[in-house]
Each structure stands twice: as structure tokens, then as C-alpha cells.
């Protein structure tokens, strides 16, 4: 859990902004969303496999585009 120490004479808004940023970096909100409902292990594997395929396709497309620009 991210913690932020409020500095002396620091406005509340600035401290809140720092806390939100640290929560975002730690992935707290994403973790809460993923644990909001139970997901069957097979559904989780299927989702992760689909994400991997999508990432790979995106990587290949980026590499092909980069190769075209070199000529």
C-alpha cells in the first residue's frame, strides 16, 4: 500500500496528487478491478492468452512498419 508523508507547509491537493500517482504506479486500482469479481481459472488463462496474442501482433506490426521506413 503506497504511503505519502505530508511535508511541512505542503497543500493537501499536492499531497493527494502524490498519493494518487504512487497508487497508479503500484497498480492498486488495476488490482482492485481484477479482484472485484471471481474469475474462473480457465477464463483467466484464456484472457491472458488473448492478451499475449494481441501484444505479439502489435509487436510484429510495429517491426514491419519500422522495416518499411528504412528504405
Curated annotation (Swiss-Prot):
Keywords: Ribonucleoprotein, Ribosomal protein. Residues 50-71 are annotated as: Disordered. Residues 50-59 have a biased composition (Basic residues). GO terms for molecular function: structural constituent of ribosome. Residues 60-71 have a biased composition (Basic and acidic residues). The keyword Ribonucleoprotein applies. GO terms for biological process: translation. One of its GO terms (cellular component) is ribonucleoprotein complex. It holds the Pfam family Ribosomal_S21. The keyword Ribosomal protein applies. Belongs to the bacterial ribosomal protein bS21 family. This is Small ribosomal subunit protein bS21. The gene is rpsU.
Amino acid at each position: 500500500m503506497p504511503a505519502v508523508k505530508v511535508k511541512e507547509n505542503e497543500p493537501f491537493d499536492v499531497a493527494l496528487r502524490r498519493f494518487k500517482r504512487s497508487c497508479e504506479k503500484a497498480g492498486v486500482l488495476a488490482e482492485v478491478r481484477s479482484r472485484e469479481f471471481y474469475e474462473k481459472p480457465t477464463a483467466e488463462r484464456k484472457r491472458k492468452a488473448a492478451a499475449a496474442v494481441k501484444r505479439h501482433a502489435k509487436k510484429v506490426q510495429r517491426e514491419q512498419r519500422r522495416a518499411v521506413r528504412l528504405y
